[in-house]
Swiss-Prot record:
KW Transferase (keyword) present: yes
Protein name per UniProt: Aminomethyltransferase
Function: The glycine cleavage system catalyzes the degradation of glycine.
Organism: Leptospira borgpetersenii serovar Hardjo-bovis (strain L550)
Catalytic activity, as annotated: N(6)-[(R)-S(8)-aminomethyldihydrolipoyl]-L-lysyl-[protein] + (6S)-5,6,7,8-tetrahydrofolate = N(6)-[(R)-dihydrolipoyl]-L-lysyl-[protein] + (6R)-5,10-methylene-5,6,7,8-tetrahydrofolate + NH4(+)
Subunit note: The glycine cleavage system is composed of four proteins: P, T, L and H.
GO CC aspect terms: cytosol; glycine cleavage complex
Length: 371
């Protein structure tokens, strides 16, 4: 059994009184002051998250060979990226399932970075190395060398720009910049996993510890709170964002996983592109959708989803009590013919069917500043 890993902020979390839990092979804070308080702080002001458990994999080499390689193993169009742009994408296996959902950072035609999930970055690295061309491309897992924190919320821009002493409006949504701060180069990316405006900040480990403590104190008067995985989960479900191991896995294609919007036709075929593009055109048997309960109850993972005749039509993949909406919400994989906005369904909670409706619209408006 492998040893549970700790992020560089582990002792800081303990000093703050965080409740720690295992997650993706890491010992991580699930909450500090409380999930609802942390959730509301992120929706109304700002939340600070330790995401140093995520992976950073660098792809470098000759421009055409690097691009062709990345286009082969992903379904979104890496070719469409400009320098200093970020893209949500999926690393595919040979059957069209997801090795991981990732963000790809383009520094230049010769250099990209893949940010991968904590439990998957070693698998992603091995998968990339398996299909590496004979020459012209280098894959380097540099995760142990990087520190990453996320500052999220409607006040994130105000707090971070004042903290740095510079404006950040020039960094557009899903773009990043290399900034010099106190003699250290940091990557500041306008991305996140909460449905709110904010930044994901990459740095060296020693400097990352300074950034966390500095931002924590600087943002406190504006309502900033340190936030754990509990709030991160309620926030992402409200934003209808998938989580690997729940809505995403190595069996379901991007279409079946509800992220079909990232599937593109490309100049050259990619892993299972024929199958995936056919699904995008013709549909699939099952698909991920969001739902909201219309009566009391809290849905969790792997609950049965029923139609109003009592027939099983799918299973929940994620569920929670929404602090923003004050009701149970979740995501589920259900039969495609049943997917219609406002369609009444039932979620079986403790063997009791609870009424719910399918929703195709966002649960919350959020504060993301789209370009």
């Amino acid at each position: 059994m492998s040893q549970v890993k700790r992020t560089p902020l582990y002792e800081t979390h303990r000093a703050l009184g965080a409740k720690m839990i295992p997650f993706g092979g890491w010992d991580m804070p699930v909450q500090y002051s409380g999930i609802i308080a942390e959730h509301n702080a992120t929706r109304e002001a700002a939340g600070l998250f330790d995401v140093s458990h995520m992976g950073e994999i660098f792809i470098t080499g000759e421009p055409k060979i690097v691009l062709d390689f990345l286009e082969l193993v992903t379904c979104n169009s890496v070719a469409s990226l400009s320098d200093f742009q970020v893209q949500y994408n999926a690393i595919l296996n040979e059957n069209g399932g997801l090795v991981d959902d990732v963000t790809i950072y383009k520094f230049s035609a010769e250099k990209y970075m893949i940010c991968s999930n904590a439990s998957n970055y070693e698998t992603v690295t091995a998968h990339l190395l398996k299909y590496l061309p004979a020459s012209g491309v280098k894959v380097s897992d540099q995760s142990p060398n990087w520190h990453q924190i996320a500052l999220q919320g409607p006040k994130a821009n105000e707090i971070f720009s004042k903290f740095l002493g510079r404006e950040l409006d020039s960094i557009k949504y899903y773009h990043f910049a290399l900034l010099d701060y106190q003699g250290e180069e940091i990557i500041v990316s306008r991305t996140g996993y909460t449905g709110e405006d904010g930044f994901e900040i990459y740095s060296s480990i020693p400097f990352g510890l300074k950034l966390w403590s500095g931002l924590s104190e600087f943002g406190k008067p504006q309502g900033l709170l340190p936030c754990g995985l509990g709030a991160r989960d309620t926030l992402r479900i409200e934003a209808k964002y998938p989580l690997y191991g729940h809505e995403l896995n190595n069996q379901w294609t991007p279409i079946e996983s509800g992220i079909g919007w990232i599937v593109k036709e490309k100049k050259n075929p990619y892993f299972s592109s024929g199958k995936i593009l056919s699904q995008k055109k013709n549909g699939t048997e099952f698909k991920i959708v969001a739902f909201a309960l219309t009566e009391a109850g809290v849905p969790r993972e792997n609950f049965r989803v029923l139609d109003f005749q009592g027939n099983e039509i799918g299973k929940t993949t994620s569920g929670t009590f929404s602090p923003s909406l004050k009701k149970g919400i979740g995501l589920a994989s259900i039969r495609t013919e049943k997917i219609k906005d406002g369609e009444p369904i039932q979620i079986e909670i403790r063997e009791q069917p609870k009424q719910a409706i399918i929703t195709t619209k966002p649960f919350i408006p959020g504060s993301i500043r789209k370009n």
